[in-house]
Amino acid sequence: MKDTPPTARDRRRRSGRVTSLLLAVLTLLATVGLTTGPAFAAPHAGTAPTVSAAIPQVPDNAVDAVAAMQPSWNLGNSLDAIPDETSWGNPPATKALFDTIRAQGFRSVRIPVTWSNHQSATAPYTIDPTSLNRVRQVVDWALADGLYVILNIHHDSWQWINKMATDHDQVLARYNATWTQIATKFKDEPRRLLFESVNEPVFDNADDTRKAQLLDELNTSFHTVVRQTGGGNATRLLVLPTQACTPEQNLMDNLAATMSSLHDPNLVATVHYYSFWPFSVNIAGYTRFDATVQQDMSDTFARMHDTFVAKGIPVYLGEYGLLSYPDYTHQDYVRRGEALKYFEALGHEARINGVTTALWDAGSFLNRNTLQWRDPGLFAQIKSSWTTRSGTASSDSVFVPKAGAIEARTLTLNPNGTTFRGLWQGTTRLTEGSDYTVSGDQVTLTASALTRLTGDRAYGINATLQARFSQGVPWEIKVITYDTPVLSDATGTTGSFALPAQFRGDMLATMEAKYADGSNAGPANWTSYQQFGTAFSPDYAGKAITLTPDFFTAVNDGAPVTLTFHFWSGATVTYHVTKSGSSVTGTNS
């Protein structure tokens, strides 16, 4: 689950996974140094597109059925919201929403549901009939569009299921009662409806062995309860997760053992993937989709394939995305171009490994009020990745200094199996030789072309180019005029501190924080590179960089901290802050 607000809930949901990922990161950092087109049309606002009424026939074989579900989409932050469907900022789901999803090429939807706020917490754990009927209505809308639907128990996982180790009998009784009611309500629905036992299951006060036992018990009990309700549930596809839906090898091995013990051909494995954690949240200097991040992705998908797919067990990647991108409520924490590379590569890895993927959308991709994609170019990249590769480049920007002679700039192309066809500005093709040159995988914009493209060299984006390839989505390149940013002295408090910043066309990539002795300062004391958004955040319109209360809570009183701000142009700017009680002073000298 990767959500838009509330962010506090995001941290609570991810705490177990972040801990395990952090340990892996610390191990990695001990040995690896830090490194720093044609669009798909969006539907018109408020208008449901025409959708074919053709209803797909579900293949008998589970592998073929799950393959037919590709691609998939999550109705996130809706029926899973707490306490009610609209509590987290999305409007109520409508039939028009599913019409849109179907028209945009999706073949299945995952409908997360949190039941606890609409259910008695004591026996017989009755689910409110009105809430159950509302879920049925939403499911039926999706089914009517010919979509496959995955229905689950969602945030209940950390509300009460997580207490199973210390309150075993009551948790299991409530879990079984919950699934008995759900399964009975939906037992006559078509086979295009799948049940998922529980989202991202976690267990408090238990060691790893006990956690594995508890999840095995839950998944096994889920299987028994659903099958015993009869009707379509006798052969319905059932989706079983690993602990926290994490795709680590030992956790997938545990799940494979559970599935083997059930002797049921109608089972589906599910995990989630939000990339290499430091890249996903922009911490520890992982600002780019670099070799380490790429390797994490390819290794993860290979594990899914080897553990399940190669053995005839289908995998449904129930959620994927990045933990901090996109989020329309604040500045991008991950660079858009680097995120585009991530989504392009993920589509490729899913295809070659036979994994069906479900985009986690809490409202930051599709605006559910207008039924339009918030970033059509981002969705175009995702949609293209379902069927083909796209070329990219080392950067989505070329930075040109404000003053002085303009010099040629070079980017490295990443064709990804395609062939580079040239550079365009709108409908105008640039001329190879005079505007740009190509040498191997290097494309160089000439000084004369950049002089023309930057015009009067006003700060910011002066021109947008496209690198076009033989297939896939063109790669956009922004030509940007900049100067090294200027930061000014400031005073404030630990609860409110913003240093004045003249960004001068540049954009912030990351921030380092160190004490005078060279040791790390800030919340992430295992790295000098602090987490974007958690420790600091730029305000381009307000011409400031904010240092958060969380940052100052972790800073030693009276100890000067040297901040190094890294910008996407390659420029770095040093700044100094000192906390004295609740007061903070900042200086650029």
Residue ranges and their predicted role:
Residues 75-93, 121-127, 166-167, 278-294:
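Acidic/histidine-rich helix-loop elements
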Residues 472-483, 571-588:
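Edge beta-strands of extracellular beta-sandwich domains
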Residues 173-286, 291-293, 303-323, 353:
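Active-site region of glycoside hydrolase catalytic domains
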